Amino acid sequence: MYRVNVSLFIKAQEYQLLDNFLRTTLVPQLRGDEGVAQVDLLEVMAQAPVVEIAQPMDDMVLALLISLEQERDLEYYLSEVLCERLELLGKTFGERVLYHVTPMRQIAL
């Protein structure tokens, strides 16, 4: 299993607008993309000491976790599909929502 984490950095006051955009536009598109097995949205907890040091208290960090079954899906997804999806995010929110993409591979335990 391969995953792509898209960390979304927002001001707390932007949360409702972003949440609506994610639920009505971006997540349905991601779920419909070929090779995508699952899409999850998580909030990075503000209580974590590392997060508090890295950001002011009025900021939020969300993690959009996209699961892909195969490595070939990951490579294509990163280079072709996800760029287009994130371009829409950028056009909609500009610098009010910043993001960082981290591709990951699951390690069997």
What residue ranges belong to the model's regions?
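Short, well-ordered beta-strand segments in beta-rich or mixed alpha/beta enzyme
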Residues: 2-9, 42-80
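Short amphipathic alpha-helical segments
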Residues: 14-44, 81-91
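Glycine-rich beta-strand-turn "strand-cap" elements at beta-sheet edges
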Residues: 40-57, 86-109
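Terminal low-complexity, poorly structured segments
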Residues: 26, 70, 74, 82-85, ...
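A general secondary-structure boundary signal
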Residues: 25, 39, 63-67, 102-107
